Every structure is written in C-alpha cells, then in structure tokens.
UniProtKB/Swiss-Prot annotation:
Name this protein carries in UniProt: Small ribosomal subunit protein uS7
InterPro entries listed in its UniProt record: Ribosomal_uS7, Ribosomal_uS7_bac/org-type, Ribosomal_uS7_CS, Ribosomal_uS7_dom, Ribosomal_uS7_dom_sf
Species assigned in the record: Dictyoglomus thermophilum (strain ATCC 35947 / DSM 3960 / H-6-12)
Gene Ontology biological-process annotations: translation
Name of the gene this protein is made from: rpsG
Source organism, top-level taxon: Bacteria
Protein family membership: Belongs to the universal ribosomal protein uS7 family.
PROSITE patterns: RIBOSOMAL_S7 (PS00052)
Amino acid sequence: MPRRGPVTPREIPPDPVYNSVLVQKLINKVMLDGKKSIAEKIVYGAMEIIREKTKQDPLVVLEKAVQNVTPLLEVRPRRVGGATYQVPIEVPPRRGLSLALRWIVRAARERKGMPMKERLALEILDALNNTGGAIKKRDEMHRMAEANKAFAHYRW
C-alpha cells in the first residue's frame, strides 16, 4: 500500500459514439503507442461488423461477451514455509473486467490473415457464443483454480 494513502481509481469518460465506459476501456486496450484515433477506428469498425452480423445492438453483444469471458476465480502464489502454493481467490469485479478485455484483445491479435477490426469482431462474437481464445484462457484459469482448491484455506 502506498505511503500517501489509498489510491482512488481514475474516472474514465464514456466514449462519444456509444456513450459507454466499456467501449472506452476496450479502445484503451486496443490502443498501441498512444494512437487512440486508430484504436477508435478499429473498435467502431468491429462494432459495425457485429451490428451487420447479429442484427442486434453491438453494445449489448459486447457486454454479454465480456460477461462470458470474465473469470470468477484466479490463482495467486502464496509462500508457506519453504513451499509456494497456488492459492485460488475470487476475482474482484474491476480486475475481472480488465482481464476479460485484455484476453479478448490478445486473442484477436493472435488471429491472422484479416484486418484487426474483423479479428476483434470475430473474437467478440466467439466470446458471445462461449468459444474462442479468450474463453479458452478463462477456462484454463478456472481449471487451475479448481486443481488447487485444496490450498483455498491459505487465502488471505
């Protein structure tokens, strides 16, 4: 904990098109080297692709996809005696949202052979249908937590 007192989370203004903090956070995660206008084009392009493919409001689709990817448990290392145990703990909502967006963007970047807006749109649609790289990452994290359930009493 810092000596200057508790850290207050920064207030993120909603994006101008969808008036959503979630979309603004996604834009910030997509952004590389401070190039926000490029990140905005990618995200808004992906949202248009989602609108065309699903015939639904892309904001609702994005919220559901992020909800599907958000992990409930994660493991944290804890040293006890001479051994380091992987202790499963619940993920706080802010961290869960951050992890979900990070995994969606990473999975989209790992897809190859098409523009980033298409890759992002496909990854969001996959997350909506509980498939894709981001869901695989969440399941892997849940499996690790399940495997280390015996160490849950070391929680702090």
